[in-house]
Swiss-Prot record:
Main location per the UniProt record: membrane
Topology with respect to the bilayer: Multi-pass membrane protein
Compartments, as annotated in UniProt: Membrane
Any GO CC annotation of this UniProt entry: membrane
Name recorded for this polypeptide: Putative uncharacterized protein YDR183C-A
Key words of the record: Membrane, Transmembrane, Transmembrane helix
Spans through the membrane: 20-42, 52-69
Length: 85
């Protein structure tokens, strides 16, 4: 039971990281390029907010896929409560 607050704290911090990264995608460096692609090819089919949501989701999934073995597996293995017994 001692390690339960640490576990909850880790989950909250990872959720905060996900939210911060997702909103960071709004101001990502390739924003103008994507806006040009949107106005050229997709503006007649999708609204811009839908395009932003799709773009952030794709960017987040690719980020998780690229960094899974280096960051996520490290955190879940070394920061798990079992290692503090």
């Amino acid at each position: 039971m001692k390690n339960h607050p640490r576990k909850v704290k880790f989950r909250v911090s990872s959720a905060k990281f996900i939210c911060i990264y997702w909103f960071f995608c709004l101001y990502y460096k390739d924003g103008p390029i994507l806006y040009t692609i949107y106005t050229t090819f997709l503006s007649h089919r999708y609204s811009y907010s839908t395009f932003i949501i799709l773009r952030n989701t794709v960017a987040f999934l690719s980020f998780m896929y690229k960094h899974y073995y280096t960051h996520i597996s490290y955190l879940t293995f070394y920061k798990s409560p079992k290692t503090f017994y």
